[in-house]
């Protein structure tokens, strides 16, 4: 690696990191939060088997788990304008990633809810709680505890998936690296650099996952 490449990497580091702080991290946080809310609603509908709505959410989960995320991005950003729905790249990315996360996490939460011992609900009902209260105050907290590892896995996967937003012109880290590579003609080194930054983000989340798991295990 010659001095020119080292200088390019040093000069480009913050040019790649800043879009990460401005776009990649906010995109991850916003879409995971919205996706988690969608997942909770879908999981509850699936568990209670609410008529009509259950069939709709089953179809939604089937579609978003069965099609590539990149195709979903293109349909929402490039396809919807054909029926008069015009979205900015940022909004299209948020909608797509949120729906995708919601579909995957709903199955995680549904399994976690079903894994909670039925006696927990019976005990909650016996002290005067309604079905809804038992779900939100007793069952869901235990379900989240059971699902902490797969939910973190989904979050880590989402961090990496945000790089796909570059395909619809969202200037996140990968797009920033592409632009610098086009000017410097050093794509290999720059893509390795952006890979290292993604690795740092994901490693931090892995340690956070481990910390949360240890805290929950100590609480029993």
Where are the language model's segments positioned?
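Transmembrane alpha-helices and adjacent helix-loop boundaries
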Residues: 1-220
